[in-house]
Amino acid sequence: MSLSTPLITDSTIQAATWLKNGQLLAYPTESVWGIGCDPFNKQAVMRLLDIKQRPIEKGMIVVTDSPSRITALLEGLTAVERQTVLDSWQADSINATAKQAHTWLLPIPKNLPITIPSWITGAHDSVAVRVIDHPLVKQLCAQMVSVSNPYGFVVSTSCNPSGKPPALSLIEAQSYFLGDNVNSDECVGYLKGETLGYQLPSQIGDALTGQVIR
């Protein structure tokens, strides 16, 4: 498929190829639709920041499929801090209406083999990471693993233009970023699926202090 033609697929392999080619992708998450890109592609991140009208200083959230991908990032935590983070990412039998996605600000070790780029961390010395619950996005993250992205990271921000509510469905996501609603050089693809129906908004916490940021 031409990169000038929007991708609409249920294949995580096609979606990962789209991301690796520097494109933006909308996809379902736990509670709302997200939009993201390859975090190690600066041009893609800058385009995403532009359509979201988001200052680079704020930093971006990245998601991955498993804590095992980010072992090096967890080494800066105490055993108690690490367990708190890991416990928040464990799937359980709680009803979706009571579930909440958890993102953690993790300190970046100086000896990290593949460092996290400044256009992802923004003005911070930490990176916002979530092990995502959504099975489809887990598959996508696994497809993103490479020498340059050993963490399987995908940028994750809410799928909406500035001032609009986050999309809750594929149709709503397309209404924001398909066709005339987005510039041709900012072509957005779509990974078809449904959210997990989480009713609580996602939470961001500082792994070192336990402070809830959002």
From Swiss-Prot:
Residues 9-214 form the YrdC-like domain. Gene3D superfamilies: DHBP synthase. It is an enzyme of class 2 (transferase). Transmembrane segments: none annotated. PANTHER family: SUA5 (PTHR17490), THREONYLCARBAMOYL-AMP SYNTHASE (PTHR17490:SF18). HAMAP family: TsaC (MF_01852). Required for the formation of a threonylcarbamoyl group on adenosine at position 37 (t(6)A37) in tRNAs that read codons beginning with adenine. Catalyzes the conversion of L-threonine, HCO(3)(-)/CO(2) and ATP to give threonylcarbamoyl-AMP (TC-AMP) as the acyladenylate intermediate, with the release of diphosphate. This is Threonylcarbamoyl-AMP synthase. The gene is tsaC.
